[in-house]
Amino acid sequence: MTFDFMLKYSFDKVMDDVQLLVSRLRAREESVDILRQQLCKLQAQLLSMRQCQETILEFDEFSKRVSNQPKGPLIICLAAENKQLEQLKIENKTLRNSLDEHQTALDMIMTKYRGQISKLMRTYQVEHLVQSVINPDNNENRCIKSFYPGPKSVNTPSTNSIDSQSVSQKSNSGKVDEITDGISQSLTEQFTTVASIVRDVTDRGDAYATELEEELHRLRSENAGLREILMISSDCCPDTNSNDCVLPPVSLPNKDSIQHESSSLSSIQSGRFHFLDEDSSSIHLPGIDECLSSVNVNEDSFLYNIPNPSDDSSNSGTISGNHSDEDSDEDDNTVYEVAMNQMINSL
C-alpha cells in the first residue's frame, strides 16, 4: 500500500509539474508573439522613415537645382504629381495581373466543370444502353400480359425450366439495378459537390470582380482629377518666350530733314525698300534684324533706300536711278543715322 501510495504521489507531482511547464511555455509563447508584432511594427515604421528621408533628400536636391529657374515651384509640383502618377501606374499593373490570374482560375474551373458534366452524360447514356440490353421489352411484355393473360401453368419439366430461367433473369436484373443505383447515387453526390464548389467560386468571383471594378473606378477618377490639375497648372503659367522679340514703336520727329525721292527706285533690292503709308505715325519693329533693315515714316507713299555704310561697295552696282549726286548720298546717310539712334534709344 505504501509503495502504491508513493507511486501515485510521485505521478501526481509529475503531472502538476508538467502542467506548470506547459502554462509557462504558453505564457512565454504569448510574450514572444507580442514582441514579434512589436518588432514588425517598428520595422514598418523604420522603413517608412527611411523612405521619407530619401524622398526629402531627393526633393531638396531637386529644389536646389530648380531654385534658379523662374518656374521652379511649378516644376516641383509636377515632380510630386509624377511620383503619384507612377504609384497609380504600379497599382494599375498589379490590378491587371490579379484580373488575369482570376480569369485563368475561372477558365480552369469551367473546364473541369464541363469535363465532369460530359462524364456524367456519358455514364447516363451507358446506363440506358445497359438497361435496354438486359430487359429490352419489359414494358411491352407487361402491357401484353395485362391485356392478354396466358393459360394456366402446368407442372411440366419445360414449364419448370422456363420458370427457373425467369427467376435467374430476375435475380440478374435485380443485381444490375442495384449496381446502377449505386453508380447513379455516387454520380449524383459528385455532381452535387461539384455544383456547390462552382457556386462558391462564382460567388467569390463576383464579389472580387465588384471590388476590382470599384477600385478601377476610383483610380480612374483620381487620374482624371490629376490630369485636370495638370491642365490648370499649364494654363495658369503660359509661355512668354514668343513675346520677347516684339519691340516698342519708334517715331521719327525730324520729318522735314528727309528729302523726297522719285518712284524710279523700284529696281533696288526688296530687302532694302521701306514702304511709307499715310496712316502710319509710328514704326512697329517685329525683330532686331528686321529693325535694322526697315523703317516706316509718315509721308505720302514715297520709297526710300537707306543704305548701310558697310555695304556701299556691294550696293554701288545694284542702285539705278537719279542717285549719282553726292548730296543725296549724304542725306540718306543722315536719315539712316537718325533711325539707328531712335531705335537704340527705344531699346
UniProtKB/Swiss-Prot annotation:
Pfam entry (one): SIKE
Keyword Coiled coil carried by entry: yes
Keyword match Cytoplasm: no
UniProt keyword list: Coiled coil, Glycoprotein
Low complexity compositional bias, start-end: 307-316
Polar residues composition bias: residue spans: 153-174
InterPro entries (alphabetical): SIKE
PANTHER family: FGFR1 ONCOGENE PARTNER 2 HOMOLOG, SIKE FAMILY MEMBER
Protein name (Swiss-Prot/TrEMBL): Circulating cathodic antigen
Native organism: Schistosoma mansoni (Blood fluke)
